[in-house]
Amino acid sequence: MNHSQQVPSRDQLLAKTGVLLIVDQITPPSGPVAKGVTPTVKERELALFIAVSDDGMVYAFNGHVDLGTGIRTSLAQIVAEELDLRMDQVHMVLGDTERAPNQGATIASATLQISAVPLRKAAATARRYLLQQAALRLGCPPEMLRIEDGTVIASNGSTLSFAELVQGKNHQLHIADDAPLKAIEDYRLVGRSAPRVDIPGKATGELTYVHDMRLPNMLHGRVIRPPYAGHDSGDFVGNSLLAVDESSIAHLPGVVAVVVIRDFVGVVAEREEQAIRAAHELKVSWKPFTGKLPDLSDVAQAIRDNPRVQRTVLDQGDVDGGIANASQRLSRSYLWPYQLHASIGPSCALADFTAGQIRVWSGTQNPHLLRADLAWLLACDEARIEIIRMEAAGCYGRNCADDVCADAVLLSRAVQRPVRVQLTREQEHVWEPKGTAQLMEIDGGLNADGSVAAYDFQTSYPSNGAPTLALLLTGAVEPVPALFEMGDRTSIPPYDYEHMRVTINDMTPLVRASWMRGVSAMPNSFAHESYIDELAFAAGVDPVEYRLKHLSDPRAIDLVKATAERAQWQPHTRPMQTQAEGDVLRGRGFAYARYIHSKFPGFGAAWAAWVADVAVDRRTGEVAVTRVVIGHDAGMMVNPEGVRHQIHGNVIQSTSRVLKEQVSFEESTVASKEWGGYPILTFPELPAIDVMMLPRQHEPPMGSGESASVPSAAAIANAIFDATGIRFRELPITAERVRAALGGEGQGPDAPAPAQPSTKRSKWWFGSLAGVFGAALGMLATALPWRAEIAPVTPPGVGSWSAAMLERGRQVAAAGDCAVCHTVSGGKANAGGLAMDTPFGTLYSTNITPDPETGIGRWSFAAFERAMREGISRDGRHLYPAFPYTSFRNINDADMQALYAYLMSQTPVRQEAPANQMRFPFNQRPLMAGWNARFLQRGEYQPDPQRSAQWNRGAYLVDGLGHCTACHSPRNLMGAEKGGSSYLAGGMVDGWEAPALNALGKSSTPWSEDELFNYLSTGFSEKHGVAAGPMGPVVSELATLPKSDVRAIAHYLSSLEGEPQALAANAAPQVDTHVSLSNGERVFKGACLGCHSDGLGPKLFGVSPSMAVNSNVHSDLPDNLLRVVLHGIPTPATRDLGYMPGFKDSLSDRQVADLAAYLRHRFAADKPAWQGLASKAAQVRANPGSH
């Protein structure tokens, strides 16, 4: 492991006594620069590569970092080989700016091919020196000495350890180009598979990842990003902040600071959860943002419309003449989508800006470039900044790892304490520099003899280096667009075309973008290899044979032949030659490439060839890559098994990119905010991978990391063509694209669902309240609009009631759910203030604690009982029937007295309820007198002598204390609960559907008494789902009741025999044409399946409800499902259920609509399709309700 803080720095080693140092003067690379900009030549510096210490340690240093590719192991093998050490005797240090040489960014798989060369020479230099020193001491020629495990051994048995040879002096040697390298025939480590040195520490939980790094006195930070995600240029960048209201989080515990520098806004707190909450609740005002991204609904056209600067990197023969004279012209366009680096863990960093020194623990891919950016940001010398590189959550390219380091530095500077910052998942996905889209256009064709007439290739690459975000937000750099010459990787095809022209269209980004694995080479090779496949079939020649005709590179020819042989390739000249297996079509595709990386003309890395086998379901359009045979020639393989690991990883990642990955945009903003909106390949979808590595141990090592992925897209697309006869020139090749290309045959996820019935459910009681007042006016002659005040009394003493009565009162209060409506989130129980939004205004629940001024402390029992039974307050005012006195009138006297005693014995809370905000005429309380005269019945509940005691107890609790009809019965035009067949037939409350309870045994998934009992007791039923919304706190209260009472409620409800709602018979199938069920399926698999896997996945946090039987999915209305998806279940009904996150900050209205439509189609296919889901999702998002 790289416990680099325990390793002396370069300066410490240079000053140390008892050490052999192998150094060299190097000129640090400048890093990528914009087109037309002259790179800044940095001063030469002394770089340290090898340190042999008298404490027995051998340190080796390389400026690149290990991204999970295993270079720490391979580099250690190289050093150990040259110095005849064991692997455990080499401490490999990577990337740390105070220790490792500045060898530039870790990109293009260039570590072993380029950056390891000086390290190997340094080890050879050290070996020669140590042998020379030993020869002098032992009095024998160096040829008579050998080295074993760090000890020099003479032929007579005399020994000297490395530590002894370097004692007492500081030996500094420059790398000697003439130092003899070990003969390949003598290798004992290089060329043999070695276990990864990093795996044991990761497997046993050693401190490895930057996310786990902690320091004493450390604080936690979070950042609030501006509204222009996806942009890194424009006048608004760094100039959009209006105000930050620090008072909005003044009440939160643990907040240390709010840091504002132009558009950079961050919060610092003592604990991480405090920082998260502060960032969420801090009120930040931004200027209205109108600078939207270009219209990316048509990415290809957006690229074509983007200004460009052309450069031709190859022009040979007569391209125009060849095209003009072609017997068959083929003009093709290929499109690569925007993709994410998709780091599994959001970027994280820890900065310590104290005592004049700045230290940053980072997962960066570019430590030295990051140090330069931070020096620019802080306007200080680079020497003050130390980057300590730790491993991160996986990224090949430029994600937000550097951005978050700058965030942490700014926050640490503000508070002068170490600060750890981690981005949210949404920030990582939205703000990371995307892997850019790329458009490749080819014009060419065939001659009459099947030879290539001409090849005119253009590639357009809208990307650049994506400046570190804090530099832009703080105004340290100007937000001007820049052109980077990075679209030319592997732009020249590997084939010998006589007439060929290659043109690069350099352009500024459409979206914040930067390099990603296979920078421009994967897209370019997708076009090259798809096009030659088309040429082969058009010429009537087998695709492998056709490639071989146009290859002259001997190693390429050997690889193509060997790979075809390994895969048992069957020559063919037409697609669809494999017998279909029912609805499954099978095909094979071939592709070859050599990755050419770095600044044009670049360097050639490893050669790679793919044979991909696919299965295509022509009914659903689903594509499975079932097997990949991959041939690979990387020259000398330092660690063959490590190379194999890299190839496997590349196959998996590139298959995911070809079949699934695409950033989605809505209204010109990034919509892929989490895994539901950006699906990646899952374990069940992995292909079988057969790796064939050509033995080339006498050849120089070539970069192998990215090379294996370069032919991937074309191989898979060519295989799909072989299976279906259809060419796909745009990625990803998703099921809906395949199904559409196949003519829409079959039943895919988008197949029509049954029709939506025309019947509509009634709304919350205010929905039709307008009719109340017209009727009430006609009743004023017989109803009293004003009632007498009942005089206030002195609050009863605390000891006025027995413990038994108080316990009975507690149970009555629990059964009546008093605290559910009379307590705000985070507030004192029963102190009121809960807002209840209605179409006609807002009501606020009252304070029912015994406070004499703001509560019911001066209410007599008579006043309390009148309010409960008649809806009249102590002062004579009418209450709105949102307070369910129409049910509470059923409560018997003993329970009413117990409830009064319980409430009056609670701790008083002085809290004035906000004034109701009802619009005229609904704010005229006297008008409720007529309503009461018409709909309020009198008297307590009377038991049914024909029924059991349990049934009667259940009816009493349901119709009285529990006031279930208040939510679960529909209302008439005057807002009163309907009876008869409509009793408990369902209703709406606070935007939630309260389902029908009067025919539970006849519902689509029948409720048994036991299921209902379990649900009411725990909030969960395996056959129906989880209690959410207003039902959650109801269950919480029911859980405190005697089990016999809950059983009585279940018994009573299960006995009801209402009429189940019938579906429209033989209705014409309808589908909401504005939703994509395929996209909904992807969202479900990416965001939901981990928990809702029908028992197939792990049980992690509480229950994992099945969507197949979820009542919300089978409901006539989508409201409850949408509310749970968007707002989650932040407070579960009982602790064992587990928390469900809401996705309102992660999924757009369209994505939520697609998800809901898919769930309905997948799990309730016999029900009518929901309509207008996107608008309904927007409505639910804007109106979260109070539950």
From Swiss-Prot:
It catalyses: 2 Fe(III)-[cytochrome] + nicotinate + H2O = 2 Fe(II)-[cytochrome] + 6-hydroxynicotinate + 2 H(+). The chain crosses the membrane at residues 764-784. Heme c 3 binds at residues 1088, 1091-1092. The keyword Metal-binding applies. It is found in: Membrane. Binds 1 Mo-molybdopterin cytosine dinucleotide (Mo-MCD) cofactor per subunit. The cytochrome c domains probably enable interaction with the electron transfer chain, possibly by delivering the electrons to a cytochrome oxidase. Subunit of the two-component enzyme NicAB that mediates nicotinate hydroxylation, the first step in the aerobic nicotinate degradation pathway. Mediates conversion of nicotinate into 6-hydroxynicotinate (6HNA). This is Nicotinate dehydrogenase subunit B.
